[in-house]
Amino acid sequence: XYXDKSVYFDLEDKGNTXGQXXXY
């Protein structure tokens, strides 16, 4: 869980967080 950082991480590291935060 990231909270508000998940949004920034998803935009910055879409390739890295794509596997962890694929809730979007």
UniProtKB/Swiss-Prot annotation:
Function noted in UniProt: Possible role could be the docking of the LHC I antenna complex to the core complex.
Keywords on record: Chloroplast, Membrane, Photosynthesis, Photosystem I, Plastid, Thylakoid, Transmembrane
Keyword Chloroplast (UniProt): yes
Gene Ontology biological-process annotations: photosynthesis
Natural source organism: Cucumis sativus
Gene Ontology cellular component list: chloroplast thylakoid membrane; photosystem I reaction center
Main location (coarse class): plastid
Name by which UniProt lists this protein: Photosystem I reaction center subunit VI, chloroplastic
Lineage, top ranks: Eukaryota, Viridiplantae, Streptophyta, Embryophyta, Tracheophyta
Membrane topology (UniProt): Single-pass membrane protein
InterPro entries: PSI_PsaH
Family: Belongs to the psaH family.
Pfam family, one: PSI_PsaH
Keyword flag Transmembrane: yes
Subcellular location per the Swiss-Prot or TrEMBL entry: Plastid, Chloroplast thylakoid membrane
Superkingdom classification of source: Eukaryota
